[in-house]
Amino acid sequence: MTVEVDRPCRVPIGLHPVFSIPEGGAVLSVPGARDGMIFPAEVEPGVSRLLPGGKIANLSAAPCMDGTTLDLTQLPLPCATEELVQIHAPDGRALLVRRAEGITIAMNWNAAHFPDVVLWLSNCGRTSFPWLGRHVAIGIEPVAAAFDLGTSISAGENPINAQGRPTAINLEPGIPFETWYRIAVLEQ
């Protein structure tokens, strides 16, 4: 992937692949994943369950507002919800095992460019059009960004770049930004 600009800028950057979750379910893993953070507000007010701004040490035990935890590796989730979490992913890869279909979706990316991955867990929590409470999917979104909070937050000081992880990149005219990612479907 190549990005070219016509004026100097400092911007967040990310990819937005989204995968459906089949009826037979799926298991998510992010090898090498380290600390993570829950979106700082309810993604879908009154529906989201994770603790806004909460820390995640393990994807299988994300803290909820009611004091319980939610396993984000076993999909679909057991409740209607919409969630965003950002995980440090220094290995630049994620796997989505879809056992009933006998496949694994393997995603790899340049972790030097995209040090984190945002997981968008859409689990029947949005009832407005076009989702209508039927959308069951996961976005596995490599980023150099502070969630999807925009340029001013990502390019400024924020809790993610305070940990030493870039949340924006500098782009210059005449100097293309080149990166790569790969999505593969593997038979089990």
What are these regions (language model features)?
Residues 1-5, 181:
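Short, well-ordered beta-strand segments enriched in hydrophobic/aromatic residues
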Residues 4-8, 186-188:
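Short solvent-exposed strand-capping/beta-turn motif centered on an Asx-Ser/Thr pair
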Residues 5, 17-19, 144:
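Short, flexible loop/turn elements at secondary-structure junctions
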Residues 7-15:
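Short, hydrophobic/aromatic beta-strand segments
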Residues 11, 22, 132-134:
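A short, structural micro-pattern
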Residues 18-21, 25-113:
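Active-site/ligand-binding surface loops and adjacent short beta/alpha elements
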Residues 105-188:
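Active-site pocket scaffolds in enzymes
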